[in-house]
Amino acid sequence: MSKVKIELFTSPMCPHCPAAKRVVEEVANEMPDAVEVEYINVMENPQKAMEYGIMAVPTIVINGDVEFIGAPTKEALVEAIKKRL
């Protein structure tokens, strides 16, 4: 089974980013064989954010598609991952 790639775009001053990171980490821990996670700080890697047209954080990109702007619920993230498996 190929893994679903999750890219979580955050910034150090973002008040909602820790919640998004917690959700992503929780799902990744529950689905380790299905998910590959990359955390991207937009302050350190603005070019990557520009490639996706990201203007706000947290943003979650799944397999190259912007899926969530803001922190999703765990259920919503799991559903989005399962659609791609």
UniProtKB/Swiss-Prot annotation:
The keyword Electron transport applies. It holds the Pfam family Thioredoxin_3. Keywords: Cytoplasm, Disulfide bond, Electron transport, Redox-active center, Transport. One of its GO terms (cellular component) is cytoplasm. CDD domains: TRX_GRX_like (cd02973). Gene3D superfamilies: Glutaredoxin. SUPFAM superfamilies: Thioredoxin-like (SSF52833). InterPro entries: GLR_AS (IPR011767), Thio_glut (IPR004502), Thioredoxin-like_fold (IPR012336), Thioredoxin-like_sf (IPR036249), Thioredoxin_domain (IPR013766). Acts to maintain redox homeostasis; functions as a protein disulfide reductase. Belongs to the glutaredoxin family. This is Thioredoxin. It comes from Methanocaldococcus jannaschii (strain ATCC 43067 / DSM 2661 / JAL-1 / JCM 10045 / NBRC 100440). The gene is trx.
